[in-house]
């Protein structure tokens, strides 16, 4: 939890994750320029932030290494909903924690959150985001 690893740029693919400016991002597009007479190939990586939704891009040599976040995908149950936060209970450890609604909840499911339902949440670099609904209890 909160870990990261190093991966060579040439091994990255769209749909994977990368750290750009210490923000975990999902890779949307990678374009590789062919090497010149005296140089190495360069990769332009365009990615979207998981927590803030901002588009970021970097250019790196394909032989360089970049940081990749290790994302823990877990299941939790919504215990309470306040105007600013959602209180979640982890279904494995039964730990309780608060997730801010502004940055910690996926936009598509904000209206569907109810107490008692299970959700999938991602934890990386000490931050948590509720990504999708797992099912509803009656």
Swiss-Prot record:
The text of the family note is: Belongs to the eIF-5A family.
One GO CC annotation: cytoplasm
Stored SUPFAM superfamilies: Nucleic acid-binding proteins (SSF50249), Translation proteins SH3-like domain (SSF50104)
Report the function annotation for this chain. Answer: Functions by promoting the formation of the first peptide bond.
Keywords, comma-separated and alphabetical: Cytoplasm, Hypusine, Initiation factor, Protein biosynthesis
* GO BP terms: positive regulation of translational elongation; positive regulation of translational termination
Question: Which positions does the record annotate as the modified residue Hypusine?
Answer: 37
Q: Does the UniProt entry include the keyword ATP-binding? A: no
Where is this protein localized, as stated in its record?
Cytoplasm
NCBIfam families from the xrefs?
eIF_5A (TIGR00037), PRK03999.1 (NF003076)
- What protein name applies here? Translation initiation factor 5A
GO molecular function terms listed in the Swiss-Prot or TrEMBL record: ribosome binding; RNA binding; translation elongation factor activity; translation initiation factor activity
Gene3D superfamilies given in the database record: 2.30.30.30, Nucleic acid-binding proteins
The record's InterPro entries line, in alphabetical order, gives: IF5A-like, IF5A-like_N, NA-bd_OB-fold, Rib_uL2_dom2, Trans_elong_IF5A_hypusine_site, Transl_elong_IF5A_arc, Transl_elong_IF5A_C, Translation_prot_SH3-like_sf
Q: What is its main location?
A: cytoplasm
The organism sits in which domain of life?
Archaea
